[in-house]
Amino acid sequence: MELGVLLLLTFTVGFLLLLASQNRPKTHGHLPPGPRPLPFLGNLLQMNRRGLLRSFMQLQEKYGDVFTVHLGPRPVVILCGTDTIREALVDQAEAFSGRGTVAVLHPVVQGYGVIFANGERWKILRRFSLVTMRNFGMGKRSVEERIKEEAQCLVEELKKYKGALLNPTSIFQSIAANIICSIVFGERFDYKDHQFLRLLDLIYQTFSLMGSLSSQVFELFSGFLKYFPGVHKQISKNLQEILNYIDHSVEKHRATLDPNTPRDFINTYLLRMEKEKSNHHTEFHHQNLVISVLSLFFTGTETTSTTLRYSFLIMLKYPHVAEKVQKEIDQVIGSHRLPTLDDRTKMPYTDAVIHEIQRFADLIPIGLPHRVTNDTMFLGYLLPKNTEVYPILSSALHDPRYFDHPDTFNPEHFLDVNGTLKKSEAFLPFSTGKRICLGEGIAQNELFIFFTAILQNFSLASPVAPEDIDLSPINSGISKIPSPYQIHFLSRCVG
């Protein structure tokens, strides 16, 4: 459904739902200031047509780093700036550890799974997931070994193209997905596997749709738009198809389950289900399993692959940066072995470039919504229990109080005067606090090895001149996606 039709529908039926909204429970407490809302419509008139992110950044200029907006009929507290976000998610971590609702995903996830659960369910699932992923990441085949094996497959695959022009989207999706698949499903897939490619396409479609303006309008008025056609229906359809695959995989795991040798996340979860089958209140049931696997598969694939796509688009835009990275690679690693994680500390410029790519790309500008778990005093305001809170991660990644030129790509943001890697409290691409991304460590390891392995083995070329390359994202709502592009990977000859 087109955005204009959605908005017309909103205004047309708004007065009907205004009657229903009068029955909603009134909030107590003292929320931060913000623009005056209209009944039911909330702050729709203050929303920028270019999306929620642009709207929030404009409101920050007027109201400061903490303010309230009404997304349709519901109040949401917006947190901007590094210090404010860290004050909430780190200093008052427990109070802000609840998970808010993502309307376009809720019909499928319904508060299940490690990412979208709340309360004891979330604590139990997160503890289990952290331990399980750590065990499979640090066991006989560590995550580093898995990534290095995948990097070798990647290099061999790119060499098959012999420098021909290609769109790197599919292959970057494949390598990222194979790492999380090896941990969750216990297997990797061939890059040409049709079922695998179908799953990756569904993930890519869904991530793109979530960043669309229509999806953002749905977040405002999901209460009645859910009854009409729109992007939310397509998102649910896509996710259900992925869930069907996960269900099938779970049944295969169940049929071959060996209690003595669990080989992946699903096996380990099934064993825990069996152990707790007499507990009628257990959180280890089928629904939490499949939604947890869906969440890990989705986030473990799309964020890393999109970062890699941005990485090489940026390198095409700034070829002098790529050349400087390659010089460091040649000095530290050479050409006769793959990069290892131990190399990272000896390669501060490369590490700084990867940090700056993540900062500049800003893939998830509006972090997943939080919810306060109790009535909470925050910076002089009283947030009632269950108040939704949006941390605007983009406002930290582009915080002028921490980065001299926040809107410019500059690896020097992460280097001190001695050329050593410089940490920054504003570096929050994975959020922070108790809800920080489960796979942060794995993702950082993937980015270093994949990025370095490619530049070790290939020079880059584009049919577009560097000055004409556009780094602007397609969407700038709850996700940012680079425009599709073509690239040559040309084999390097290094002595």
From Swiss-Prot:
The record's InterPro entries line, in alphabetical order, gives: Cyt_P450, Cyt_P450_CS, Cyt_P450_E_grp-I, Cyt_P450_E_grp-I_CYP2B-like, Cyt_P450_sf, Cytochrome_P450_fam2
Q: Which positions bear Phosphoserine? A: 129
Catalytic activity reads: an organic molecule + reduced [NADPH--hemoprotein reductase] + O2 = an alcohol + oxidized [NADPH--hemoprotein reductase] + H2O + H(+)
Q: Which UniProt keywords apply?
A: Endoplasmic reticulum, Heme, Iron, Membrane, Metal-binding, Microsome, Monooxygenase, Oxidoreductase, Phosphoprotein
In short, the EC number is 1.14.14.1
Domain of life, per UniProt, equals: Eukaryota
The enzyme class is oxidoreductase
An example Gene Ontology biological process: xenobiotic metabolic process
According to its record, what are the GO cellular component terms? cytoplasm; endoplasmic reticulum membrane; intracellular membrane-bounded organelle
Q: What is this protein called?
A: Cytochrome P450 2B15
Q: What is the lineage of its organism?
A: Eukaryota, Metazoa, Chordata, Craniata, Vertebrata
Q: Which gene encodes it?
A: Cyp2b15
